[in-house]
Regions:
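Canonical Rossmann dinucleotide-binding motif of NAD(H)/NADP(H)-dependent dehydrogenases/reductases
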Residues: 2-36
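Short C-terminal tail/terminal secondary-structure segment
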Residues: 19, 135, 213-214, 225-238
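Conserved mid-core segment of classical short-chain dehydrogenase/reductases
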Residues: 83-98, 116, 139-142, 182-186
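Catalytic Tyr-X3-Lys loop
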Residues: 92-109, 126, 150, 200
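Amphipathic alpha-helical dimer-interface segment in Rossmann-like NAD(P)H-dependent oxidoreductases
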Residues: 102-120, 158-159, 163, 218
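Active-site helix of classical SDR
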Residues: 111, 146, 154
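Residue(s) in the substrate-gating loop at a strand-loop-helix junction
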Residues: 130
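Short, small/polar-rich loop/turn modules that mediate ligand/substrate recognition or access, typified
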Residues: 162-167, 224-226
Length: 238
């Protein structure tokens, strides 16, 4: 069974750094969808093939989100990938607050502002959670808390938006090869531990997350809402 959906309007928030958001946007564009991406940077590291537009967007800026939303009367798929992590100092209150502001509050505000456009189509929202939605880590307490919040937010919004035929789901990646994980991959001990604990014996790739995203956005997932799919190569079951 091949998942293929064409001609839909997609917005992928947080797709400027050649990571998960970029892979999802690329997959959506390859299937003939109209895709717009955003990122915190002025320009993306590279523009995914087939993607129509890039907009710089700070998701802690309400006015900027509202300005972007004026471009959409209707939106079929919203993907929320924007997130930050501050591994060295997340225990500091101001840093903790900033991570929560971006990863949880910012993504929630994006959903709120684009809600009307998604209701217009009976659309699909895909949030990017994390295996840290379920696993603890002393080094990223703010990141883990924010991603646990995304998991619960997904469930709550799924209940709220179901009467409008809008589905809300999340994907919880494990260790994936991205710019954000570059430091960890360069640490030989950490890299070995990740590979040893992962039953598939490797780090995930952004494309490993794009496949489930395409499924959740498709009509084949029409009866799925409020779910968080863990995509971690089995890391969390070890």
């Amino acid at each position: 069974m091949k998942v293929k959906e064409t001609g839909k309007n997609w917005l992928v928030v947080g797709a400027s750094r050649n990571g998960i958001g970029t892979a999802i946007a690329t997959a959506a564009a390859q299937q003939g969808n109209r895709v717009i991406i955003t990122g915190a940077e002025q320009e993306p590291l590279s523009m995914p093939a087939g993607v129509g537009e890039y907009h710089q967007l700070d998701i802690s800026d309400s006015l900027a989100i509202k300005s972007l939303a004026t471009r959409f009367e209707a939106l079929d798929v919203l993907v929320n990938c924007a997130a930050i992590s501050r591994r060295d100092n997340e225990e500091e209150i101001e840093v903790f607050r900033k991570v929560i502001e971006i990863n949880l509050i910012g993504n929630y505000e994006v959903i709120k502002i684009f809600e009307k456009a998604l209701i217009a189509t009976g659309g699909s929202i895909i949030n990017i959670a994390s295996m840290y939605s379920f696993l603890g880590s002393p080094k990223v307490p703010a990141y883990g808390a924010s991603k646990a919040g995304i998991h619960q937010l997904t469930r709550s919004l799924a209940l709220k938006l179901a009467p409008y035929n809008v589905r809300v789901n999340a994907i919880a990646p494990g260790f994936v090869v991205t710019e954000q994980t570059q430091r960890g991959r360069a640490d030989a001990e950490h890299n070995s531990l990740v590979i040893a604990r992962t039953p598939f014996g490797r780090w995930g790739l952004p494309e490993d997350i794009a496949g489930p995203a395409m499924f959740l956005a498709s009509d084949q997932a029409a009866f799925i809402t409020g779910q968080t799919i863990i995509v971690d190569g089995g890391y969390s079951i070890g």
